[in-house]
Amino acid sequence: MIYYGTMFDHKVRFSIVRMREVVEEARNRHSLSYLATVVLGRALIGAALVTPWLAEKERWTLDIEGNGPIRRVVAQSTSEFTVRGYVANPKVELPLNEKGKFDVAGAIGQGVLRVVRDLGLKTPFVSQLPLVSGEIAEDLAYYFAVSEQIPSAFSIGVLVDSGGVKIAGGFAVQIIDRTLEQEKVELIERNIKNLPYITELFQKAEPLDVLERIFGEKVGFVETAEIRYKCDCNREKAKNALLVLDKKELEDMRKEGKGEVVCKWCNTKYVFSEEELEELLKFKVDNSGS
């Protein structure tokens, strides 16, 4: 569940989310290792936190590429409060870092963060920045500060063990009106700095309690929505993906008796029979003029 709203005469906006089930679904769909679960989980939470601020029908993509062993993590969210994502190396594992935590920064390494905002226009808006930490929360705050000139704080965490995902969630606070009194800015900064790790916080406190600790007072009107893992892949799109292949690749599949397309976002497998591949080959030939 995501909670979102504004504070201090709408000069500050916030979102806070708990989404253990969503991250657990991602872990199961992609058969993720512990570390890969934490990396993708953090990215999905980051993408979920911005959903209340998206335009209608907007698709927002966080794409992190680094020289670490996980290589790439991608998370996408929509204005309908859905998320989906994947990592390039779902089996990655590393020793715990010096703080005894999962080494997310080590898994990602040095690299770049891209944010793609697709508003349904001809060309999506793309921003690219160097990673500042590889921990994802700090990188998101840096992106908003530099690319969108919005001072932001993000805190994101995932706790996983042999039984699966135990806790997954985070919060984002953004100053959207620079006329906010300096004492309020300092209050928010101080309160956030004094908070424990989000995974520890969510073991003891509910989201509204966390917001009260951040702002130093009870929040007023809060909206809520359910975050869902949802992919828009289907058999027709999988068929179109096969049509992109050259004729020889399709013929090789047909000779093997079947063809498979696996969705990178949700790991759904679409299997096409020999007869279906024959039809695709015929369609390809008929439409190529050869």
From Swiss-Prot:
Q: Where is the signal peptide?
A: none
Localization (cell) = Cytoplasm
Any one Gene Ontology biological process term? protein refolding
Quote the InterPro entries the UniProt record gives. Heat_shock_Hsp33, Heat_shock_Hsp33_C, Heat_shock_Hsp33_N
Modification(s) after translation: Under oxidizing conditions two disulfide bonds are formed involving the reactive cysteines. Under reducing conditions zinc is bound to the reactive cysteines and the protein is inactive.
Q: Which Pfam families does its entry note?
A: HSP33
Q: Which UniProt keywords apply?
A: Chaperone, Cytoplasm, Disulfide bond, Redox-active center, Zinc
Q: Which superkingdom does the taxonomy of this entry point to?
A: Bacteria
Q: Which GO terms describe its molecular function?
A: protein folding chaperone; unfolded protein binding
Q: Specify where it is mainly localized.
A: cytoplasm
Q: List the disulfide bonds.
A: 231-233, 263-266
Q: Give GO cellular component annotations, separated by semicolons.
A: cytoplasm
> What HAMAP family does this protein's entry cite?
HslO
Q: What does this protein do?
A: Redox regulated molecular chaperone. Protects both thermally unfolding and oxidatively damaged proteins from irreversible aggregation. Plays an important role in the bacterial defense system toward oxidative stress.
Protein family according to the UniProt entry: Belongs to the HSP33 family.
What's this protein's name? 33 kDa chaperonin
Source organism of the structure: Thermotoga petrophila (strain ATCC BAA-488 / DSM 13995 / JCM 10881 / RKU-1)
Q: What is the primary gene name for this protein? A: hslO
